[in-house]
């Protein structure tokens, strides 16, 4: 101990020895990608990944979205164990089979679409949701099959169908097998229409490519989350093609609503109540109680 240390009151450091820092668990805080606010992760999850400061809708996993929609303990998953195969033995920088394994390990899911049947405020409902964390929510054979099985389940039990889209489009590693899903999913909705059952499409950020060009825009009612990017090609690709500057907000949900391409915009936190009210109206039933 130096002579200076002896003279200084206790608790005041006189050397450059780093102090012990209280450990903070990783992942406890997250930065809003829009306003930059530091957000407490448990509160953000409770708020359905919507920034409480600026209202920015951040990415949410498919199971969390469906859990927020359905009544508690009412769900049964559809085609839960159905997984993709590399029929074309496709390889770019990596083998497609390797990409599948990596995506499954990172997400804990078999593929990019989760489908369930359950209850929404006591009424039967079938719903599916894309998981963008799985290969950008790309649509391959499994996504198309799960979507179609969900539509068939809705017909079997006489329930409406809701799909939350979030996708970069068709999965290029499956080639024409992927593109065929555009027709397959659209045909599945035809059966739903013949049965007189409603289909509500909820477009979230981003919904592009083959998904936006097929079932995502075929809802009896098309709803979008705020500021969602919706279109076939992205704005940068369009600008490079036409060599013109696009209007501000082009392809965002507010722009599409203004030009009649979608029916309404709904905050994610209000989506459950909004869907329950719309489905009651379409089914000519009394509005459900707020819950």
UniProtKB/Swiss-Prot annotation:
Q: What class of enzyme is it?
A: transferase
Pathway participation: Lipid metabolism; malonyl-CoA biosynthesis; malonyl-CoA from acetyl-CoA: step 1/1
- What is the UniProt remark on how the cofactor binds and its stoichiometry? Binds 1 zinc ion per subunit.
Q: Which GO terms describe its biological process?
A: fatty acid biosynthetic process; malonyl-CoA biosynthetic process
Q: Which InterPro entries match?
A: AcCoA_carboxyl_beta, Acetyl_CoA_COase_Trfase_b_su, ClpP/crotonase-like_dom_sf, COA_CT_N, Znf-ACC
- Could you tell me which NCBIfam families the record lists for this protein? accD
Output the Gene Ontology terms for molecular function: acetyl-CoA carboxylase activity; ATP binding; carboxyl- or carbamoyltransferase activity; zinc ion binding
Q: Which reaction does it catalyse?
A: N(6)-carboxybiotinyl-L-lysyl-[protein] + acetyl-CoA = N(6)-biotinyl-L-lysyl-[protein] + malonyl-CoA
Q: Where are the zinc fingers (C4-type)?
A: 32-54
Into which family does the record put it?
Belongs to the AccD/PCCB family.
Predominant location category: cytoplasm
Species of the source:
Stenotrophomonas maltophilia (strain R551-3)
Q: Which PANTHER family match?
A: ACETYL-COENZYME A CARBOXYLASE CARBOXYL TRANSFERASE SUBUNIT BETA, CHLOROPLASTIC
Source organism phylogeny: Bacteria, Pseudomonadati, Pseudomonadota, Gammaproteobacteria, Lysobacterales
> Keyword annotations for this protein?
ATP-binding, Cytoplasm, Fatty acid biosynthesis, Fatty acid metabolism, Lipid biosynthesis, Lipid metabolism, Metal-binding, Nucleotide-binding, Transferase, Zinc, Zinc-finger
The protein, known as: Acetyl-coenzyme A carboxylase carboxyl transferase subunit beta
> What the protein does?
Component of the acetyl coenzyme A carboxylase (ACC) complex. Biotin carboxylase (BC) catalyzes the carboxylation of biotin on its carrier protein (BCCP) and then the CO(2) group is transferred by the transcarboxylase to acetyl-CoA to form malonyl-CoA.
- Tell me which domain of life the UniProt entry assigns to the organism this sequence originates from: Bacteria
Quaternary structure?
Acetyl-CoA carboxylase is a heterohexamer composed of biotin carboxyl carrier protein (AccB), biotin carboxylase (AccC) and two subunits each of ACCase subunit alpha (AccA) and ACCase subunit beta (AccD).
């Amino acid at each position: 101990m130096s002579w200076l240390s002896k003279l200084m009151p206790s608790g005041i450091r006189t050397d450059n020895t780093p102090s012990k820092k209280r450990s903070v668990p990783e992942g406890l805080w997250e930065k809003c990608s829009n306003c930059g606010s530091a957000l407490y992760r448990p509160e953000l999850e409770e708020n359905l990944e919507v920034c409480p400061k600026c209202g920015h809708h951040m990415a949410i996993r498919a199971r969390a979205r469906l859990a927020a929609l359905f009544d508690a303990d009412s769900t049964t998953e559809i085609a839960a164990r159905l997984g993709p195969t590399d029929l074309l033995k496709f390889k770019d920088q990596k083998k497609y089979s390797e990409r599948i394994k990596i995506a499954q390990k990172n997400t804990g899911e078999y593929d990019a679409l989760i489908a369930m049947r359950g209850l929404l405020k006591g009424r039967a409902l079938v719903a599916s949701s894309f998981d963008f964390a799985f290969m950008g929510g790309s649509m391959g054979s499994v996504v198309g099959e799960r979507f179609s099985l969900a539509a068939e389940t809705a017909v079997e039990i006489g329930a409406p169908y809701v799909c939350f889209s979030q996708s970069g489009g068709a999965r290029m590693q499956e080639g024409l097998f992927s593109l065929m899903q555009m027709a397959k999913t659209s045909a599945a909705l035809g059966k739903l229409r013949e049965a007189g059952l409603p289909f509500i499409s909820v477009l979230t950020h981003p919904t592009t490519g083959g998904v936006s060009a097929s079932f995502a825009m075929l809802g009896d009612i098309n709803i979008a989350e705020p500021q969602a990017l919706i279109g076939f090609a992205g704005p940068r690709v369009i600008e490079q093609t036409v060599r013109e500057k696009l209007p501000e907000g082009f392809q965002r949900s507010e722009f599409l609503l203004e030009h009649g391409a979608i029916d309404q915009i709904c905050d994610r936190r209000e989506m459950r109540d909004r869907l329950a009210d719309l489905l009651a109206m379409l089914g000519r039933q009394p509005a459900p109680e707020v819950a």
